[in-house]
Amino acid sequence: MSSSSRRPARRAALTARSSYDESLVDAELESYLGNARSRRISRLRRLSADERQRETETEALIALSLGFPIDELLPAERPLLPAPVAAAPNDYIVVRNHILASWRADPRVPLPRSRVQETVAASYDNLVAVAHGFLAREGHINFGVSAAFPASPPPDAPQRLAASVLVVGAGLAGLAAARQLLRFGLRVLVLEGRARPGGRVYTTHLGGDQAAVELGGSVITGIHTNPLGVLARQLGIPLHKVRDSCPLYHHDGRTVDMKLDRSMDLVFNTLLEHATRLREYLKKAAEGISLGEGIERLRRFYKVAKSVEEREVLDWHLANLEFSNAGCLSELSLAHWDQDDQYEMGGDHCFLAGGNARLVHALCDGVPVLYEKTVKRIEHGEDGVSITVEGGQVFKADMALCTAPLGVLKSRSIIFEPELPERKLEAIQRLGFGLLNKVAMVFPHVFWDEEIDTFGCLNKERSKRGEFFLFYSYHTVSGGAVLIALVAGEAALEFEKVDPAVALHRVLGILKGIYGPKGVTVPDPIQSCCTRWGSDPLCSGSYSHIRVGSSGTDYDILAESVNDRLFFAGEATNRAYPATMHGALLSGLREASKILHASESRLNSDYKKYALQKSIRLINNVLDDLFMEPDLECGRFSFVFSYITPEEEQAPGLARITLEKPLLLPSKKRKVKGNQKDQDPVAEKIDQEVFYLYATVSQEQATELLECDNDKSRIAVLCKDLGVKLMGYDSTYDVCSHLISSISRAQKARKRLQGPKSLKTGL
């Protein structure tokens, strides 16, 4: 997803947000967020009027950077407040902003309402209760992945009837939603088409598994108030600021003259400012013009970038703009391409040490996920939802959350029954879904400048301006000499047709052209990998943008639920933060709140629940998958364990006992006359069905059971000698959901350890 250390300056669009100037408030936010303890103590001191005003203003800036209006209520807040407070909400807004700032000051532990009440006057307790409840429910506070935020309800949470939710996709949006829903007390299962979590956030390991390489979303863009920064802080993962220096090189290896570079940078940003004025002048007519066409008209009108070298440098900046938007400038809407700039998060752009997969796996912890379950059909109606995956397996639940990428929705590879509303289909069609590809390389050593994180290369041909135009160095965070070449714009589309060996040869030619004249030998990489995101049927592209004819409203339409049964999340449903990793995560938190509200509303209306344990059971499918390849079998007993190596004798596991269940007792058999058998043929058929009982056992206990002579003895030893309680489907899921997830992860880990798999080039 989109990121760049040399992101195009787009300040012309920030006039509506003049009260927030990133360059002026970054230091203040850093000071506030970086010293939680001293700030809390200061709240308890007697502050002067000026000090309190200063603190209130800083907290308002934090709220603003989180997407809250600085002096207004969110639409969802107004109905929660008494009419007099809603009419004059200043006190509530100050309290709300204080809660947001307090949470962000130290997000490693939950922020209970009682702690907030200790820092404000008692007369505001009611406002604290409303604001704290709203912010926690909406996922603005008290979310995360540390031990303090497990994927289960808090011990003091109220008991509620648990609705069931199927989540399509284990990317950042799906995992964030699933984790939040589990904390709300709902029943959740995630269906993921890949054999791994993360979706378009994909950290692989090259060079003998030593170096972490980002093939998908890579940079945390704007660390201030970024929820990904919250997760990193909770996990204690260090962040590396992407340094600003980004030298440019000609295609023959010469360094671009600094004066020329600065001149064209100014020209580029001036063209963008004039493009903003052009659309204001054209008004409605701008809706049908592309950003590329507008910039080219302006370039010719002002007669800038006329020489070959000037044009090549300007093209580099245009390629960088195409990278930021994952789309060709000829497709981007002049009228709306930068509609999200006013929400852009402040602060440095950062790399995460060890790769973004660390965040993904932390989000996965405790969340039940079934992998290699490609969704083909989603049926939704008054009775609930039914999802069919490739191979015909069916899952049913009360509600479903679809986090499929926009590219998948565009491809119509998922059938919706009934069809999605026409306005949603039209929004899917209008929005753009572009492409960014990469060539990732691990070298024996770092031969480039270790004091920079990025450098760029110009191209002669305009159609190829995005081919290997920017290089990212990950040697500071990856554990190896990792260099990644980016391919954007038209070049990204053509790149999908290029043989990986040819692509690697071109990249090495560029690097040798840059460093050879400096006397530096460019070694062959130890290992390399080329992405093919456009050819990947599980995403069909990289991230969204606003195409000609579209607008930010289409993001909102894509986020709309269907009859409170079918919900949608993902970066392409987040109008404020599209095309970003944090936008995906925030959309998942948003939908978790909507699903909880829909669930509670349905219960309050005396709705007949369509629970997980009814009909085709969700948990039945989960357990069937676990026992497809049992670790041990004997008679009617099967065993699966959470160990990774067989030496872990105390590793917990599950035993499954297969039994026959006559559903019609002999005393209830239907008496018939004549020569017919005294047996109901339907009952005879049902009598042949089986059911399962489950028990938690260790590997050591399972070995003891296997030594018994028969199944009857095993049951006696299990229940009497070992004192183990047998459970049905529902109890097993309620009691053992975390163990089920652990066994599933262990099974996948053991498969990986059975032998190294060949690394395929591409995705």
Curated annotation (Swiss-Prot):
The Gene Ontology biological process terms listed for this entry are: chromatin organization; spermine catabolic process; thermospermine catabolic process
Q: What does the UniProt keyword field contain?
A: Chromatin regulator, FAD, Flavoprotein, Oxidoreductase
Any single GO molecular-function term of the entry would be: oxidoreductase activity
Q: What protein does this entry describe?
A: Lysine-specific histone demethylase 1 homolog 2
Give the family from UniProt: Belongs to the flavin monoamine oxidase family.
User: Does the UniProt entry include the keyword Hydrolase?
Assistant: no
* Species, as recorded: Oryza sativa subsp. japonica (Rice)
UniProt keyword Hydrolase present: no
Give the top-rank taxon of the lineage listed in the UniProt record for this protein. Answer: Eukaryota
Describe its function: Probable histone demethylase.
Record-listed FAD binding positions: E192, R194, R200, E571
Annotated SWIRM domain residues: 53-152
